[in-house]
Amino acid sequence: MSDCIYNIRKRSDMTSATQNKKYKVEAYTDTVKYYYEYLVELSKNKYKSILPYIQYILINAIKYRVGEEIPENISPTIKKDYQNRIINIIKQIDDDVIINTNKVVLDTKLYLLKLKYDELPKDDLEFKDGFAYFKNKKIDKIINKNSFSITNMSLKREKLWINGLIKMSSYFEFNHLYVDEVGKTYKINLLETDKNRKSFLNDDMNIIKSFSGFITLDRKKTRLMFYTKYNELDIIFKPNINIDKHNKMKKRCGILKNKIYSVKNNRTLLIEHFLLLRFVIKYLREVQMYFKKN
């Protein structure tokens, strides 16, 4: 049921296309009334409750709506009524349905639970072993492949400069990136960005922060581990190298100026900084060209 599929009417012309619906008043009035609320009442009248299958249909539709800002052409009255109706439906959805619906990231699940309970009950929320739990039920991984990305790296006089982004649920408060390098820990400040994902209530569903800093490399070969802290919890990131979008080997190994980097165990970044021999450079370039052509 968490992967439910349902049919949608064939659209008669481009004026009713999906990409235009967010600017139409009907999307915030008729759709909610004659689709979402209709299903709720139909199920209650026939079965005295909202069937799990109906709940999955509703949550699969609503999950997109809570993560979209309402356009300015919608009047404040309609906007407020729409928000209240959506929240009222969410309050009738079972926790298990919100938690177990597939293809919904942790940010959205936590936000849906927050809307249901007005505020997330901290006593019921737990983080351990890299997962988030609500009332002892596993929700999802705390981080995913898009949570941490390195957008630029450069080596200057034994200093490795690193730039990147951290993307996490707005539930977490995090202000620093920590980099562990054999016996040393570096603390890099995180900066606010204007890339946060806004909800239909115009608050933040997730927070994206940028970082820029350097670490001093005293060895020819070292390992780096990246993490941030939330209260007493260490949130360890899996390096996502995003230097060259055309390089299909970027997640496993690559070449940047005068160093080799590679990801080991999905958690640590192995740095070898030395001048490469000409044949090694030539070989790696040939491999890169092969992947680009194919």
Q: Which residues are covered by each model-predicted region?
A:
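Non-catalytic N-terminal targeting/anchoring module and adjacent flexible stem/linker
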Residues: N45-N294
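Short amphipathic alpha-helical segments and their helix-coil junctions
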Residues: K33-S49
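Nucleotide-sugar-dependent glycosyltransferase catalytic core
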Residues: S2-Y34, E68-K79
